[in-house]
Design a protein with these regions (language model features):
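Heme-based O2/NO sensor domains and their adjacent alpha-helical segments
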Residues: 10-17, 31-112, 116-118, 125, ...
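Short, motif-level signal for alpha-helix interfacial/capping segments enriched in acidic residues
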Residues: 21-23
Length: 140
């Protein structure tokens, strides 16, 4: 398995000589993406069990910082929280195919709401599909 740093470096996909972070408009775009994603999560009975109410604002901040860093922005996530260790950090939640599919449905809707360029959309969705599948930690 590749290290997070290797994945972060691999994610610095360039479009016309800029990172995805720069191409989509920087931190503000990722803040909007995550806000729209969690609006869907908050209304989803499958995912509400995975996201405790008292931690939604913390989850929002963590995901925003992680995505900003992953897609080529500042390394604030790692500076505050250390190595992302995505699988380890998600082990305490029961994530099966149903939860993964619900998560991906809301993230895809949030991405599409931004109306990104097709090549950027593909990069984002490919990453979210792969990563959400890797978070599955219980059988179907």
């Amino acid at each position: 398995m590749r290290s997070c740093r290797a994945l972060a470096m691999a994610s610095k996909v360039y479009f016309h000589s800029v990172t995805v972070f720069e191409a989509v408009g920087g931190a503000d775009t990722f803040k909007v993406l995550v806000e729209r994603f969690y609006a869907g999560v908050a209304a989803d009975p499958v995912l509400r069990a995975v996201y405790p109410e008292e931690d939604l604002s913390g989850a929002t901040e963590r995901l925003t910082l992680f995505l900003i860093q992953y897609w080529g922005g500042p390394d604030d996530y790692s500076a505050r929280r250390g190595h992302p260790r995505l699988r380890l950090r998600h082990q305490r939640f029961a994530i099966g195919q149903v939860e993964r599919d619900a998560w991906l449905r809301h993230m895809t809707a949030a991405v599409d709401s931004l109306d990104p360029a097709p090549d950027i959309r593909k990069s984002l969705i490919d990453y979210f599909e792969t990563t959400s599948t890797a978070m599955i930690n219980r059988p179907a």
